A protein has these predicted regions:
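Outer-membrane beta-barrel biogenesis signature
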Residues: 28-86, 91, 167-176, 346-354
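Short loop/turn motifs that connect adjacent beta-strands in outer-membrane beta-barrel proteins
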Residues: 31-33, 60-69, 101, 118, ...
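Hydrophobic, lipid-facing positions within transmembrane beta-strands of outer-membrane proteins
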Residues: 55-57, 68-70, 105-109, 153-159, ...
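Residue-level signature of outer-membrane beta-barrel architecture
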Residues: 63-65, 113, 125, 161-163, ...
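Detector for outer-membrane/organellar transmembrane beta-barrel domains
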Residues: 68-80, 198-199, 203-291, 343
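Transmembrane beta-barrel strands of outer-membrane/channel proteins
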Residues: 74-78, 123-127, 177-183, 231-235, ...
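Outer membrane beta-barrel transmembrane domains
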Residues: 85-89, 93, 244-354
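Outer-membrane pore/translocation modules
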Residues: 126-249, 296
Length: 354
């Protein structure tokens, strides 16, 4: 029989995490909110070079909305995977067939809102459809059997706090603290786990599909005409799960991002991006438990995405790109075509670039 303690433990862990999330912000308010950008610094940044555009595809914006501004961002992400990497970190020249061919699409919608000039709240939800077939059958050209499912993905809540805003007259970048809770709505609604077990790479840090997760991140951005450079590192802890009455433990996850934007036309928001992405599952857990599920020797994916961003109107922007796997270990080799649009709204009637 399944343990009756696991659900209670998960509820307690979730409640504790919410308490720590809100408590940490309260503590910052009481002790560290003296370390915030001054109004003059924010005004100086807002008046500096920063073209209105979509920005990077594969990282949440480091700088945050001004108070009272909102954006809605539909993001369409797809995956084509027919090869895989072995137990050693290797290049595409060493990739192998199998074990499965996987094709998936995953629309994601993110809504973000500026609570203050220092805090931004976000929420994201997604759908996923995937089709998977064993490699031997696929290579032989035989029909079926396919494993396929369509359903709801996971739901994320994101809180960002920016203690440092960049100075256009010095090398100082913006620095933002990133906190995310992933609720396993895919599991709650019965969506089957896709091969590999990860939510697709994309806008948010990759997490384990269908599992309660807690992410802490540190991000930065610096604008220097005609370039914008941003990046971040994120650590995700997955709560213990349960399978056939056994408590399951998977490795924690580390995501990194490094993005270069080069603007060709400021007024049109036209730029090209080079976006570097890595996802690494660890051989340890923050709670000290041994790993009994997933890639016990760890896994790594390194990808690079060329992208183009553009402006449609003074409140609507978009971007399109393709993410290519350039190295991997115990992971799928895949390409990920993707595109997004983003609509801005401001209570003053005039939107501002973050």
């Amino acid at each position: 029989m399944p343990s009756t303690h696991a659900p209670t433990g998960l509820r307690l862990l979730f409640a504790l995490s919410l308490f720590l999330l809100t408590g940490s912000m309260t503590e910052l308010s009481a002790q560290a909110f003296d370390w915030v950008p001054k109004d003059e610094e924010i005004k100086k940044y807002r008046q500096s070079w920063n073209p209105f555009s979509e920005g990077p595809l594969l990282i949440q914006s480091v700088d945050i909305h001004p108070a009272g501004q909102l954006s809605v961002r539909p993001f369409f992400f797809s995956q084509i995977s027919e090869k895989s990497y072995g137990n050693q970190l290797s290049l595409p020249t060493d990739r192998k067939d199998g074990p499965v061919h996987t094709y998936s699409i995953s629309p994601l919608v993110t809504v973000t809102y500026g609570l203050t000039n220092h805090l931004e709240l976000g929420a994201a939800t997604s759908l996923i459809s995937f089709w998977s077939k064993d490699t031997a059958s696929a290579n032989a050209g035989r029909g079926g059997p396919w494993t396929t499912d369509t359903g709801m993905g996971d739901f994320s809540l994101v809180l960002k706090y920016r203690p440092i805003v960049q100075d256009p007259e010095s090398a100082r970048p913006s620095v933002t603290l990133y906190q995310q809770i992933v609720l396993p709505t895919s599991r709650w609604t019965g969506t089957e786990r896709p091969p590999g077990g990860f939510a697709p790479l994309g806008r948010l840090p990759a997490t384990r599909f269908g599992e309660l997760g807690f992410t802490e991140g540190l991000t930065f951005r610096k604008n220097s005409n005609p370039f914008r450079i941003s990046g971040g590192i994120y650590y995700t802890y997955s709560a213990p799960g349960s399978d056939a009455g056994q408590t399951t433990y998977v490795g924690d996850t580390i995501n990194t991002r490094l993005i270069f934007e080069h603007f060709l036309d400021d007024k049109r928001g036209l730029a090209y991006n080079i976006e570097l992405v890595t996802v690494h599952t660890t051989t340890w857990r923050a709670d000290g438990h041994g790993i009994n599920r997933g890639a016990r020797s760890g896994s790594t994916v390194v990808g690079i995405e060329p992208a183009i961003q553009f402006k449609f109107t003074d409140s609507l922007v978009g971007a399109v790109g393709v993410l290519f796997t350039i190295a991997g270990q115990n992971a799928a080799d895949a390409i990920y075509p993707n595109f997004s649009i983003q609509w801005y709204w401001n209570k003053t009637g005039k939107v501002q670039m973050r």
